[in-house]
Design a protein with these regions (language model features):
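Enzymes and membrane/adaptor proteins characterized by extended Gly/Ser/Thr/Asp/Glu-rich
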Residues: 97-116, 147, 153-155, 164-168
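Solvent-exposed loop/turn tips at the surfaces of repeat/solenoid architectures
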Residues: 37-38, 57
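Acidic, glycine-enriched loop/beta-strand segments at the rims
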Residues: 21-30, 40-51, 64
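Extracellular/periplasmic ectodomains of large secreted or surface enzymes and adhesion receptors
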Residues: 1-37, 68, 75, 92
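Histidine-rich, glycine-flanked metal-binding segment
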Residues: 44-84
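Alpha-helical scaffold segments that flank or form the walls of functional sites
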Residues: 102-145
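Polyanionic/metal-chelating signatures
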Residues: 1, 128-184
Length: 184
């Protein structure tokens, strides 16, 4: 029936979030990449006609000129383009499953965001698309001392445990202003 074929064709056109983390049995293999001819902002200097070498998902070299390409590297010519470091979001509430606020008591320093990280939150993907590479996940402001934060490296398709940055410092959220008054 032609009507059924038309409906099926139309329904497959509109996918509003990526499938990568859903339905695949493994995460895509990291490839070797060299970005050349870029204007690179390092945070300390601006490098004109610079190159960045990425091997096995890690940046191994940043500098002026061209460098030896890693084996089987994909080469990206970034002439006229800019490359910057990833953005670190120091105050975020993404990737938290039903645990932003602990409002039962004024002090809840014993609770931890690490226990409620949601690795399937579509906002991880959206943050990555906007250049955010790491986030500090904080409790809300329903009480003055809301609990322990978590620092994650944004990686779409990973488990909650694999999002956590190794040997991260521990922090507790304090909210000593109008938010606490408004939420109670």
């Amino acid at each position: 029936n032609d009507d059924i074929k038309t409906v099926q064709a139309d329904t497959t056109k509109h996918i509003w979030f990526p499938n990568m983390a859903f339905g695949l049995d493994s995460i895509a293999k990291q490839e070797n990449i060299i970005i050349k001819n870029a204007t690179i902002w390092t945070g300390e200097e601006v490098i004109q006609n610079g190159s960045i070498v990425i091997q096995n998902g890690k940046i191994t070299h940043v500098g002026a000129g061209n460098f030896k390409s890693p084996p089987n590297a994909r080469v990206i010519d970034a002439e006229g383009k800019y490359v910057t470091s990833g953005i670190i979001d120091e105050h975020s509430h993404i990737a938290i499953s039903k645990g932003v606020n602990e409002g039962g008591q004024a002090i809840s320093a014993e609770v931890s965001i690490r226990d409620v990280i949601d690795p399937d939150d579509i906002n991880i993907y959206r943050q990555l698309a906007g250049g955010v590479t790491a986030s500090q996940l904080l409790h809300g402001s329903a009480n003055p001392i809301g609990g322990q934060s978590a620092i994650i490296k944004l990686k779409w398709g990973e488990t909650a445990e694999n999002l956590l940055i190794d040997k991260q410092p521990l922090f507790i959220k304090f909210a000593l202003g109008e938010n606490v008054k408004q939420s109670n």
